[in-house]
């Protein structure tokens, strides 16, 4: 509901926080994390972009919430799962006799790049985000009024390991908003889901200072 609700007032950051921290038998990898699955989008049920903006699954709001959902899936502790076509904003409900609309892969190439980049971060392919492969998470910033969460992911901690994820669930671009970091030192932005690199309609907002 935090993703697909029309009004910011209905987004419950405590519920999202609890979902991020939930695990079975103290093992983060005993659960699968997703926003779309066979059961969720089959038999006439809608996919996330369609739920966000019915009849206009390629709108700014639909794309933003799709990217936000993907960002959570690939940075939360657990086994990430995406459903076929999710990476290019497939909006039709799943039916095993209907093929995917592969033209959307080119039409929404920027959204596909979101998934490529998030998968690379999740797998620590550049040796900078090992924490996303680990068990540990600390949701240390929960702002119910502005609909912002920040959490620290780590495996052993330190350079090339610790990762901070900041997510804005609201429909507003927040300027001059400050979030503390868990430890002192130099931090670098590795992914900005609001970048126009991913979609020309995005605001290109993001972190201007990290220390």
Predicted regions and their residues:
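A polyampholytic, Gly/Pro-enriched intrinsically disordered region
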Residues: 4-5, 209-211
């Amino acid at each position: 509901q935090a993703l697909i609700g029309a009004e910011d007032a209905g987004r419950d950051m405590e519920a999202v926080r609890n979902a991020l921290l939930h695990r079975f038998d103290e093992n983060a990898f005993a659960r699968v994390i997703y926003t779309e699955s066979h059961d969720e989008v089959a038999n006439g049920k809608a996919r996330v972009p369609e739920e966000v903006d019915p009849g206009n699954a390629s709108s700014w709001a639909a794309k933003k919430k799709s990217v936000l959902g993907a960002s959570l899936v690939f940075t939360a502790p657990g086994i990430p799962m995406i459903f076929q076509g999710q990476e290019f904003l497939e909006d039709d409900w799943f039916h095993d006799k209907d093929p995917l609309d592969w033209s959307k892969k080119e039409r929404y190439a920027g959204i596909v790049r979101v998934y490529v980049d998030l998968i690379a971060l999740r797998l620590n392919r550049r040796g900078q985000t090992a924490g996303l492969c680990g068990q540990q998470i600390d949701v240390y910033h929960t702002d119910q009024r502005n609909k912002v969460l920040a959490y620290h992911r780590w495996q052993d901690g330190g350079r090339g390991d610790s990762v901070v994820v900041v997510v804005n669930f609201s429909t507003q671009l927040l300027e001059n908003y400050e979030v503390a970091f868990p430890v002192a030192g130099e931090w670098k932005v590795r992914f900005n889901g609001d970048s126009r690199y991913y979609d020309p309609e995005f605001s290109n907002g993001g972190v201007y200072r990290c220390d």
